[in-house]
Curated annotation (Swiss-Prot):
The chain crosses the membrane at residues 16-36, 56-76, 99-119, 131-151, 191-211. Catalyzes the methylation of methanethiol (MeSH) to yield dimethylsulphide (DMS). One of its GO terms (biological process) is methylation. This is Methanethiol S-methyltransferase. Its EC number is 2.1.1.334. It is an enzyme of class 2 (transferase). It comes from the Bacteria. Belongs to the nurim family. It comes from Crocosphaera subtropica (strain ATCC 51142 / BH68) (Cyanothece sp. (strain ATCC 51142)). GO terms for cellular component: membrane. One of its GO terms (molecular function) is methyltransferase activity. The lineage of its organism: Bacteria, Bacillati, Cyanobacteriota, Cyanophyceae, Oscillatoriophycideae.
Length: 255
């Protein structure tokens, strides 16, 4: 009887972890769908470039603070030391899903509390300009999505970890590979994000702040990420760094 109860609890525990991972993933998906409208100024009543309702200084302080909260969460929870401490409190298979969940919540906070600054820097209101900018904006999202699948979408967002735990299979780290986009730049995912952030027919001060802060954050985060990748993959990644540019294809061997 006790053995059956232990097995039952084990199954319930694994089922909970699996459902938790699925919940975190779909929370992330909904956040991304909302981000398309928020950053692209489409479909939503409030977006990145909505009309200003606060003073310039107040809005700037709030917006930079919100982006700082996201950057802090995104960076701290990705550090090896934090993961080691965090997985003492939660099951290790839940770590990636929890990271995805907290990242989604941090983004939701940005969307919710964002204070638009309506000062316009550029405005391409003609049809040709809008088609070009929105096409590049859409291309950015496509590059982001495809890049995640090239390296393993389900591992990146925690589903592989919780599924293997549910199946009582050991997690194995992904092998180093450089498919498709990764043969031309080391970080195509971030190239996609840059297109998403910057390709807008209407650039307000708020949008410029958002794009600038996130771009600076990514450029700093890349340095930390590459140190981790070298630690994991060793000489393979060192050779890759020497042969493939960081962000701009066909310009030198290293950027």
């Amino acid at each position: 009887m006790q053995q059956q109860q232990t097995l039952s609890n084990s199954f319930l525990s694994r089922t909970f972890v699996l459902l938790y991972g699925v919940f975190c993933y779909f929370t992330f998906l909904l956040t991304c769908v909302y981000a398309v409208g928020f950053i692209g100024n489409i479909f939503l009543p409030k977006s990145l470039d909505s009309k200003s309702q606060e003073s310039l200084v107040t809005a700037l302080l709030i917006d930079v603070g919100l982006l700082g909260i996201f950057a802090l969460q995104h960076s701290v929870m990705a550090r090896k030391q934090f993961k080691a401490w965090w997985t003492r409190l939660i099951p290790k298979p839940m770590e990636r899903s929890t990271y995805v969940l907290f990242s989604s919540l941090a983004l939701m906070l940005v969307f919710w509390q964002w204070h638009p600054i309506g000062i316009t820097i550029w405005n391409f209101d003609n049809l040709v300009g809008q088609i070009i900018f929105y096409s590049l904006f859409a291309l950015g999202w496509v590059i982001v999505l495809v890049s995640t699948f090239l390296i393993n979408h389900f591992d990146l967002f925690g589903l592989r970890q919780v599924y293997l735990y549910f199946e009582e299979k050991e997690y194995t780290p992904l092998k180093f590979k450089t498919p498709a986009f990764y043969q031309y730049v080391r970080h195509p995912l971030y190239v996609g994000w840059f297109l998403v952030f910057w390709m807008t027919p209407i650039m307000t001060v708020a949008h410029l702040v958002f794009a600038s802060v996130t771009t600076i954050y990514i450029l700093v985060a890349i340095q930390l990420e590459e140190k981790d990748l070298v630690a994991i993959h060793g000489e393979k990644y060192e050779n890759y760094r020497r042969q493939v540019p960081m962000l701009i294809p066909f310009i030198g061997k290293k950027s």
